[in-house]
Structures are given as C-alpha cells and as structure tokens.
Amino acid sequence: MLRIVWKPLKIRLPVWRRYQSNISINSIRNVGIIAHIDAGKTTLTEKMLYYGGFTSHFGNVDTGDTVMDYLPAERQRGITINSAAISFTWRNQRINLIDTPGHADFTFEVERSVAVLDGAVAIIDGSAGVEAQTKVVWKQATKRGIPKVIFVNKMDRVGSSLGSTIRSIYTNLDCPYPLVLQLPVYSDGLQERKFLGILDILQQKMILWDTSDNKLGTDGTHVQELPIPESHMERFIEARNALVMSLCDVDETLCDEYLENEDSLAFTNDRLFKIIKQKTISGNVVPVLCGSSLKNIAVQPIMDAIIDYLPSPVEFYEKNASKETSSDKIISLDKRPLLAKIFKVIHHASRGILTYVRVNEGTLSRGMMMFNPRTKKSERAIRLYNVFADQTQEVDCISAGNIGVISGIKQFHTGDIIINKENSKNFHEYLSGNQSVISIPEPVCIASIEPYSLKDEPALLEALANMNREDPSFRYTQDLENGQLLIQGMGIMHLQVSYERLVSEFGARASLGKVQVGYRETLIDVSFNSVTLSTENKENLIINVYLIPISDEGDETLKKYFSEGEIQKVRSKGQEDGVLFYGWKPENSCTLPDHLSFQRIQENIYFGIVAGLSHGPLHGFPLTNLQSFCTISSFLSNDFPLSLLTQASMKATKNAVFSLYKRSPKSFRILEPYMDVTITTPEEYVGIVSKDLVGKRGATIKEITEIGKNAASKDSQIAIGILGERYLPADEPSSVKANNASSLLQSSSVIKCIRAQVPLEQILDYNSVISSLTKGNAKFLMSHPMESQTPKLVNYGSSFHPMSMQRQKRIFP
C-alpha cells in the first residue's frame, strides 16, 4: 500500500514576505547546483521548487516554462546561461538555491556563484559518469573549500550504473571518500526493468516511489517505506560495511568503537549521521545519493541531504575561521558589522541596475551608507529585495547568511566587498584574510560588431558597457584610429548569446561579424625601461618598469626588491588582466605626497602597465602571461597629479616592450587558446578521429580509455590503486529495453573516450566534422583547460599556450 511520506507545502508566491520573517542564520543553507551540461540541473531544481511548495506544477525545460531558466535564450536553447537564485523552505529551513550553467562558455557564471556558496550539490549523469565540465565545476568548488554532496541522476536510463559512476568519481575527481548512502532498486521484469526507488543505507530501509500510470501518484509524493527485503540484504550489508569502514578511515573514535565488535549495524543512525555531517563540512567525505529527477524518484532525499549534511552560514564560517577566532565571534555573525560580497550585476528593464549580494556578516538595511574598499566611495542602499529567479520582493533588510538584491547602486562591481561607511577607516582589515577573489577568465573568441548607422553607435556603446558590467567575462574594445568595435568572450555561444541580448534586451541596433579566435602575445626575455616625466612645477617623476617572462620563476631582479613571502603572495592570487603585478618599491630616498596612499599609487601604476600591454609588437595582440613591477625615484610635492603615474607607467611599459622587440624580435611569441576536448565514439572510429585530431588539427591526445574502464592518466592510475581498497556498488540493469535504445552509450559496440587538447581555431566548427567522420556516432564536448603549462604562475583556468612556428607561419604568413 502506498502512503504519502513527503507532501508539497502549500506556500505560493503571494506570501513571499514569509521568507524574510525571523529565520535563524542556523536554519539557512546557501547551496549551488553544479554539473556538466544536460546532467539535469534545472530539472532537479524545478522539482525541488515543487516539493518545497514554491510552485504548483513542474517546470519543464523542453516546454520552456521553467522558473529558473527565464531568459528567452535559455528557453529557446534549453540550457542554463545565467545563474539564477531563488529561496524556498524545506523542513522549516530556508534553502537559498543557485542554479548554475553547465556549458563551458559560461564557466564564469559558475565561478562567481561558487564564491558566495556554503555548499554544493554536484549532479552526475549516471549513464555518462564524470564528464569534462563536471571536472571544471568540481575544481571551482573545491578551490574555495565548498562542502559537496553528489546526486547521481538519470538512474532510470539504460546504461546507468552507480558502480561505474563511483569508479569515474575516484578516477576523475579529487574525491577520495565518496560515501554511498543509497543504492538503486529496480523491478524484476525480464524484458523491462524499471527504476523504482532506493535502499537507504543509513536509515536501513527501502523506499519505493509510485511509477504507475496513475497521474495522481507519479508526482513523486506517493512513496512506500519498507524494511530491507531478503533479496537485497546482501547488497545492503556490503554497502553498510563500506560506509562504516570509510567513516572509520576519517574518524579515529569511530574506528576504535568499531574494533570492539566489528559490527556495522551496531551504530545508531544518529551516531553515523553526526560524523557524516562533520566530515562532509570539513571536506573529508562526500555523500553520494542517486535517483531520477525526470521521473520524480528520490528528489526529496537530496533535499534532506542539503539540510542534513551541508553547512549553515555559521558552520561554514566556523570551518574557515582561524584558530584564534573566538566562539563568540562565530556565534554572533548577525551582530557583527556589515560584510557583504557582490557576485553578480544585471540590468533590469524597469528597476535599472540590480546588484546581487551575499551578506556574510551583519545586516544590510535599507537606507544604509555602504562603503566600497576598492573604489573608496560610498553609496546608499535605497531599495533591497529578496530574489526569486526573475522576480523580486522588496524588503527592509538582508540579514547575515542571506542572498538578496540592491537596486540602483553604481559604484560596485562583481567581486566587490561592501562594509559599513562607519567602518571605512578599517577597510584593509576586511580586504585581508579569507576574502577570495572572483577570477575573471581571459576571453578566447573575438568578433566585430557594427552599428547600423552612426546615430546607433552611442546606444550600442552604452549597451556594451552595461553588458560588460553584467558579465565581466564579456569584453569590448574600440580601435582609436578606425573606430572598429570588437567584442570578446569565452566561446562562440557566449558571443552569440551576448549579441542576442544586446539586441533584444538592451535595444542595440547592430550586426555581428564572423567569430574568430582571440590571440595574445608574450615575451620570453626580461625587459626594463625608465621614464622621466615633468610636472607643471618642473618636478621630475622617475618610474622604472620591469617586465619578466611568466616562466622565469627565479628572476634575480625580482628577488632584489621583493621577499619570497611577497612573491608567493602575489603568485597565489594568480594573474589579473594577464599580468602578475608585484607592486612598486621606492628608490633613492623617494618622497611622495602625503595624501597619496600606497594603495592608490599602486592602482594607478597598474592601470598604466595594463594599458601599455594592450598592443604587442608582432601583430598588435594584447600581451599576457608575464610578471611586472616598478620602482619610483622622485621628490614630489603635495600638488602632484595622480594621473601622471598612470601616464608614466604606460609609457615606460610600451618603451620596454618595443625596445626589446627592436633588439630581439625573437623574444616574443604568439599565444593561442587551446581547449580540452572529449570525444566519445565507438571503437571502430577511434583511429580516424585520432588521425584527424593529430594530423590536421595539431592536437595532443592525453588519453584514450574505454567507457566504464579505468583511465590511463597518472591521476587515474593513482585512483586505480585506491579502487583496490574501495567499495564499488555492483551494477544493476537499468530500466529501458536495450533494443529501444538510441543514444551513443547504448550501443552494443565498445565505446571509447578520447581526451585531447586542441587549438581552438581548429575546432570552431568541429561538430559537423566529427559527425561526418563517425557517421553521427560520436559525442563531442569542449571545456576550458583547468591546468596550464606553468601552473605555479599562470592564472587559474588559463587557456593560452604558445603557438608552434609551423602554425604561426600558416596563420600569419
């Protein structure tokens, strides 16, 4: 007999204000959904909204009525482009949920969203295992110490395997202890085996969902809880033993208790639950659950896992707090001075600029004067909102631990920190410590954009500025000589979507040119130049700019002016605008005006250096992947103009570049963007695909593996050793008749996976090529590289590698 265990709450949009009323910070979960494209992120999110009582029906990606994917481009393409935030309740707890894109072109959306999360749900397609973009988003979350739970989705699909997915987690992700908390349960039919539910390893029960044709029962709220049947007892005991043994590996106390009786069933559920939560938050383990969001099976348990295992803002703060931080500070986050972080800026048709903010400490109240430590400017918070995807509700305040929106402010950008105006004198305290920077990746594609007429140009420029403010990974430049406008982005789709939004949302009248690859230049020798500029008072500003190759870690000139600690601090942050800038040092008893702070001087020098690197000597491409610093030798009065610093550093940088080129043209190299490529194809096509990649496109093949087998890479070989001691659930046949299968992975032939790194210029339109080579029997995916050739120095996610001389002669004859 079926009975309702979970029932949707009857909360609807008119009562939004309930979400603001007296919810303890300990009852909040700030969680992101991260995954590869098409893993089921938005579908899972829409089901959560239904079970949380936010919606009265399931939003569907295919029919274009989802709450979270609300942009026209998202509904047209059926993919997530913008990260969307929404709040709903589950078990009397508030979940602030962010659904992020899975397409490689929109990886910056994930980066800035992850920066404000306390936890993440990583979705993995059970029929495909860990995919290319899964690795990228996993590393983004791991880099920031975000606790995670894994949801193995699509367990209803043919070819889905929890065991193979766990294997791929071991071999592809930095996840030594995935805790299998659930096993899939299928029907016993010979011809067709349906996915019915799960074995709950922790709660020691079987949970089945109604999969009949009864529409009243298939919304996922009708379930049956049963004792573990004898037919599944062996699987259950094996999984239970593995769960306890994994926890013993990370908890000595539990290990000692286990050695007394060696009985995994002797531990209470509460005892294991507390350890799982503690070790999940610390990052030692990752709970693994399974289900099918499309079929409404086992969605509620993942919502329970968000509440049970992922941290509240207080718990996440405590995890990252230094040992010197007192417990009083941790407990009273909402009583501390304001500290908030901006992670997104958009332009609303009627409300203007909307700034998304996560309040880490204190309370952001309407009318409060906010101070920006970066710009040293203040603005008043006129209106505040709770956010529900594309809809908002005005509120009086945004409390600690919550996510909200500020409207109308102009002095704050993505990544900025907000503090009280009253605390502005101590802003350096807020910029130090654990405030991580949101990295803006270098664009890899470029296209011209032309206004239809001269009168359309001002509106186009304004739209481009707004788009850049909203999405810093989208950039634009205008040639000072011929006025040509160029837009830059993370890929073809990124530029196409950005252009569509410029036209449809911002009202720009313009045409888009052909998308091309954006190249860069770099230097391989040290260069130096000194510039002397005179003020109106005939005072001389003497500035010396040094440019050092990115590969030169041990440059003696750098070590002469900076300590090892200063050097490592800059390198740990990575490049910004393609430069590792170490700052400036005074020389020869340098005296500067009292009103100029060290930071303001450094900012203006940096702006000048970046401007000086905007055009390289080979083909006019921007210079990147280099290190720089400068020294100042001056005796200046208090009326010294700050702009002179920018002018001098820009001139010295240009002189350093072109004087080196004049002496040694071979000291410069062209860089081109590379992409990580994953091609899944039947074994018979591996030879022809590999030949095309290497012979025609200059690719480097990293590995060729069989789907479901262990990878051959170094990291995977390490994981293979681990697998000998780790639990892998036995495979269960999945639901659909094999002869009805049409996808690639359902083929009866051996499926191989080719992983390679390829110049982007060679694969701009590779989908049609790979389809022709394999007669439509291949799956082609691209992602931005996560590892660079100089990992100690190059910015996270750098895609640019030196171009071979052979390719350089062909492309630039």
From Swiss-Prot:
The keyword Protein biosynthesis applies. Gene3D superfamilies: 3.30.70.240, Elongation Factor G (Translational Gtpase), domain 3, P-loop containing nucleotide triphosphate hydrolases, Translation factors. Keywords: GTP-binding, Mitochondrion, Nucleotide-binding, Protein biosynthesis, Transit peptide. It is found in: Mitochondrion. One of its GO terms (cellular component) is mitochondrial matrix. Residues 1-20 form a transit peptide. GO terms for molecular function: GTP binding; GTPase activity. Residues 26-314 form the tr-type G domain. PROSITE patterns: G_TR_1, G_TR_2. GO terms for biological process: mitochondrial translation; mitochondrial translational termination; ribosome disassembly. PANTHER family: RIBOSOME-RELEASING FACTOR 2, MITOCHONDRIAL, TRANSLATION ELONGATION FACTOR G-RELATED. HAMAP family: mEF_G_2. Belongs to the TRAFAC class translation factor GTPase superfamily. Classic translation factor GTPase family. EF-G/EF-2 subfamily. Mitochondrial GTPase that mediates the disassembly of ribosomes from messenger RNA at the termination of mitochondrial protein biosynthesis. Not involved in the GTP-dependent ribosomal translocation step during translation elongation. This is Ribosome-releasing factor 2, mitochondrial.
